[in-house]
């Protein structure tokens, strides 16, 4: 039997039509909480809504790591903030604080020889139900009149300093909500307070909160998220400007209403 050509079969090695994956994607703006100077920090891509796959659901839960220098327009910042997308309104992703850490180069630059490195960490719950774990780091410091090359602290002093670190981290976080905690982390006021409080035990330097992790979150509430994105200073009064006019001024007569 002669073998004929099957017209239904396609040609061997036929090229498939290449579809650009970016044609089915769309851009969304990323908005940071109002505690930072810069709110619009960038854009993100997601596949368009197709059938049961909704675009906004694909964005929720995304974590963005942004330099604090970009958020506050400051070049000298050495912290990285983690922001998580919790809600999507229109083409805008509303983010919330999700963590913080020091940059690698800063962490390497503060580590010194001939000094004692002291670390402490504690899990604390904020007043609005967020469970945070804070990591603190500090280094011993030479006295002004010290001739000795090294400045190592005794283990008893290290225990006292570590207890002081835990005490101050608990005190600063327990009575504050997440927004207040972020306001304290940006200038690192907690690290400065710890350094001052431990000065009578042993002189310290470069004390800072090196990392913050969110272990547990309360149930999501849109009202609480909107508070993070609302700045009281942005609202202005609705009063108009006063225009000086002569006493005999009469408004012009309109030809048609």
From Swiss-Prot:
Predominant localisation class: cytoplasm
One Gene Ontology term of the molecular function aspect: structural constituent of ribosome
Disordered as annotated region, ranges: 236-257
Subunit structure: Component of the small ribosomal subunit. Mature ribosomes consist of a small (40S) and a large (60S) subunit. The 40S subunit contains about 33 different proteins and 1 molecule of RNA (18S). The 60S subunit contains about 49 different proteins and 3 molecules of RNA (28S, 5.8S and 5S).
InterPro entries documented for this protein: Ribosomal_eS1, Ribosomal_eS1_CS, Ribosomal_eS1_euk
Alphabetical keyword list: Cytoplasm, Ribonucleoprotein, Ribosomal protein
UniProt organism field: Brugia malayi
Database matches in PROSITE patterns: RIBOSOMAL_S3AE
Pfam families: Ribosomal_S3Ae (PF01015)
Family statement: Belongs to the eukaryotic ribosomal protein eS1 family.
Record SMART domains: Ribosomal_S3Ae (SM01397)
Transmembrane parts of this sequence: none
Biological process per Gene Ontology, one example term: translation
Chain intervals with Basic and acidic residues compositional bias: 239-248
Record carries keyword Cytoplasm: yes
GO cellular-component term (any): cytosolic small ribosomal subunit
Gene: Bma-rps-1
Keyword flag Nucleotide-binding: no
Name of this chain's protein: Small ribosomal subunit protein eS1
Subcellular location field: Cytoplasm
């Amino acid at each position: 039997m002669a073998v004929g050509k099957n017209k239904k079969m396609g040609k061997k090695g036929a090229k498939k039509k290449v579809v650009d994956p970016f044609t089915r994607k769309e851009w969304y703006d990323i908005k940071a909480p109002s505690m930072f100077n810069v709110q619009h920090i960038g854009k993100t891509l997601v596949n368009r809504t197709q059938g049961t796959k909704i675009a906004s659901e694909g964005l929720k839960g995304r974590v963005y790591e942004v330099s604090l220098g970009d958020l506050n327009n400051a070049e000298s910042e050495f912290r990285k903030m983690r922001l998580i997308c919790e809600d999507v309104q229109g083409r805008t992703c509303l983010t919330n604080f999700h963590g913080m850490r020091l940059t690698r180069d800063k962490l390497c630059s503060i580590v010194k020889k001939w000094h004692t490195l002291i670390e402490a960490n504690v899990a604390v719950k904020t007043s609005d139900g967020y469970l945070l774990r804070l990591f603190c780091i500090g280094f011993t410091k030479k006295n002004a009149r010290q001739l000795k090359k090294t400045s190592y602290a005794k283990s008893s002093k290290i225990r006292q300093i570590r207890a002081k670190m835990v005490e101050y981290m608990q005190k600063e976080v327990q009575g504050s909500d997440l927004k207040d905690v972020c306001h304290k982390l940006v200038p690192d006021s907690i690290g400065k307070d710890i350094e001052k409080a431990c000065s009578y035990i042993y002189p310290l330097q470069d004390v800072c909160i090196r990392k913050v992790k969110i272990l547990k979150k309360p149930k999501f509430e849109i009202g609480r998220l909107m508070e993070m994105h609302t700045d009281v200073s942005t609202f202005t009064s609705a009063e108009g400007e006063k225009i000086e006019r002569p006493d005999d001024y009469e408004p012009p007569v309109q030809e048609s209403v």
